[in-house]
Amino acid sequence: MESQPVTVITGARKGIGRFLANHYVEQGHTVIGCSRGDIDWSLENYEHVQLDVAEEDSVRELFRRIRSLGRLDHLINNAGIALLNHSMLTPGNSVSRILDTNVLGGFLFCREAARLMQRRRFGRIVNFTSAAVPLKLEGEAAYAASKAAVVSLTEVLARELGSLGITVNAIAPGLVSTDLIRGLSEEKLEQVLARHAIPRLATLEEVAGVIDFLIAPESGIVTGQAIYLGGP
């Protein structure tokens, strides 16, 4: 009997990542999640690892552990940090931190995941971009730049990995009620929502629904796409 699918989720301690961890455990997956901080919850068939996604040695060690499971089906690159600040007031170390987590971390996880996925000629990678890219939101220069890089990374990897049976897509979840947007004022939140075709918060279930589609075996022809929830 074939073993259950193995899914890796970065940034799984809270918010979207935690919801997705529970969602895929309920679907019968073995889920490995990671974050910089520890968790105060537990799930059956879930393992949590503390690491910085931008630390290459730590990422390699994680995937050595995953290799022992005999398979890797899905990578959901949810880990990310945001910054709302005018470019002239943004220190360089803040920019470096954003790029390390959002771009370098995503790249390292994609690379290591692909090395395992190619063995079975099957894999699904879902990266997280942001509506800040097409909306060109003021005050989010560094964040938008990092998420634009995620789109480019997704498109190039889709071409590099397609012949190996691995698809690579991106999702921009829009505004979801998580810690990432709780610092926004009501006025700023309404301004951003007004620029979407569907001007409301996305639900966690809606985010999971799109990812369900992208990682399904039947979606093997879908790759190199960025899907923006809310339609900016």
Give the predicted meaning of each segment.
Residues 13-14:
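Conserved glycine-rich cofactor-binding loop
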Residues 86-87, 94-99, 181, 192:
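Substrate-binding pocket helix/loop in short-chain dehydrogenase/reductase
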Residues 88, 135-141, 163-164, 199, ...:
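Active-site loop immediately N-terminal to the catalytic Tyr-X3-Lys motif
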Residues 107, 122, 200-229:
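C-terminal substrate-recognition "lid" of short-chain dehydrogenase/reductases
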Residues 110, 146, 154:
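Active-site helix of classical SDR
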Residues 115, 159-163, 220:
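Alpha-helical segment proximal to the catalytic Tyr-Lys
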Residues 130:
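Residue(s) in the substrate-gating loop at a strand-loop-helix junction
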